[in-house]
């Protein structure tokens, strides 16, 4: 059986950051690495789930909404994948992502999609935890200026 592309990445060398993970046709998969892999530090489910709700909503309502294909968590709980059409340059993606992270920090209302009708596990959401994670990731993004 062929090994999938994500297993070909040497996770012992990954640091928190923002990377181009792969390109498939006109879709760029960005690795939004919040935690260093295999250190025992991971995002808990409430944090990941809430970040997913918030960032997915903000990105799909941004100026690049038509180019956002997907945003969701990594199974290893160390970050997220953001899939965007290649017509949007990485620098612009990071700029819009920073805005979405900041908007999450400023959110004072309810978590988007926080009802039984909208979400299959709506009780597992915590805006405070998501704000903490997004604030920490914004610090990581300050040092990002290359994407490979």
Regions found by a protein language model. Give the residues of each.
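Short, intrinsically disordered, mixed-charge
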Residues: 53-64, 99-102, 106
